[in-house]
Amino acid sequence: MQRNSRRVLIGKVVSDKMDKTITVLVETYKNHPIYKKRVKYSKKYKAHDENQVAQMGDKVEIMETRPLSKTKNFRLVRVIEKATL
């Protein structure tokens, strides 16, 4: 039985103001069933950042984990691309 069937998402850090927590904006695309046009959906996830390495604007990879708080169910896996200021 495989244990690692967890969701892995890629998104952009929109907030790093909380202690050891980042807010990640994940954008997905779906085709509209009637109009056949791609529609962009976005959702924000709170993720645990133990070493506080992610900064605002970074492109990051997050993975689903056990609930760490009321709204935090993801953890930071790695920073894919640093933000250019």
Curated annotation (Swiss-Prot):
A Gene Ontology biological process term: translation
Pfam families in the cross-refs: Ribosomal_S17
Presence of keyword rRNA-binding: yes
CDD domains: Ribosomal_uS17
GO cellular component entries: cytosolic small ribosomal subunit
GO molecular function terms listed in the Swiss-Prot or TrEMBL record: rRNA binding; structural constituent of ribosome
PROSITE patterns named in the record: RIBOSOMAL_S17 (PS00056)
Keywords (A to Z) from UniProt: Ribonucleoprotein, Ribosomal protein, RNA-binding, rRNA-binding
SUPFAM superfamilies, A to Z: Nucleic acid-binding proteins
Cell membrane in keyword set: no
NCBIfam families: PRK05610.1 (NF004123), uS17_bact (TIGR03635)
PANTHER family for this protein: 40S RIBOSOMAL PROTEIN S11 FAMILY MEMBER (PTHR10744), SMALL RIBOSOMAL SUBUNIT PROTEIN US17M (PTHR10744:SF1)
HAMAP family documented for this protein: Ribosomal_uS17_B (MF_01345_B)
Job of this protein: One of the primary rRNA binding proteins, it binds specifically to the 5'-end of 16S ribosomal RNA.
Subunit text: Part of the 30S ribosomal subunit.
UniProt family annotation: Belongs to the universal ribosomal protein uS17 family.
Listed name of the protein: Small ribosomal subunit protein uS17
Organism: Mycoplasma mycoides subsp. mycoides SC (strain CCUG 32753 / NCTC 10114 / PG1)
